[in-house]
């Protein structure tokens, strides 16, 4: 069974754009760099050649990863999401019950997560604690710095 990878439309488009760039722009650039380095002679002590081959290996590995992710992508249409219970795609406003600090997060796929931008992975401890909860509920999250308690203030979509 192939596990689907949930993601937003925006996340899927970003993966497709990176895949296109790596295949159509980065791959030819690296091949050219390898050919140029090869022209410099002895490959055993040719740092440019070894660096280009390493870049090629990294790029091809990422292409394989992106092809797999886009093939297994389950694009979730956030415009069709609604309801009071928190699930994938929800924007959730929380208040830290100790510091009274408010935070807003959107629950997204693993590949889209960017905490600084307010996007947390569906598989993160805080997202797992939020799934199925509603406004007014409290959650407790075991974070690296200790346990944190939050109250859910708002749930929105889109």
Curated annotation (Swiss-Prot):
PROSITE patterns: GREAB_1, GREAB_2
Gene Ontology MF terms in the entry: DNA binding; RNA polymerase binding
Keywords tagged on the record: DNA-binding, Transcription, Transcription regulation
Pfam families registered for this protein in UniProt: GreA_GreB, GreA_GreB_N
Transmembrane segments: none
Gene Ontology biological process terms in this record: DNA-templated transcription elongation; regulation of DNA-templated transcription elongation
InterPro entries assigned to the protein according to its UniProt record, in alphabetical order: GreA/GreB_C_sf, TF_GreA/GreB_CS, Tscrpt_elong_fac_GreA, Tscrpt_elong_fac_GreA/B, Tscrpt_elong_fac_GreA/B_C, Tscrpt_elong_fac_GreA/B_fam, Tscrpt_elong_fac_GreA/B_N, Tscrpt_elong_fac_GreA/B_N_sf
Top-rank taxon: Bacteria
Family: Belongs to the GreA/GreB family.
Function statement: Necessary for efficient RNA polymerase transcription elongation past template-encoded arresting sites. The arresting sites in DNA have the property of trapping a certain fraction of elongating RNA polymerases that pass through, resulting in locked ternary complexes. Cleavage of the nascent transcript by cleavage factors such as GreA or GreB allows the resumption of elongation from the new 3'terminus. GreA releases sequences of 2 to 3 nucleotides.
PANTHER family hit by this protein: TRANSCRIPTION ELONGATION FACTOR GREA (PTHR30437:SF4)
Protein name stated in the entry: Transcription elongation factor GreA
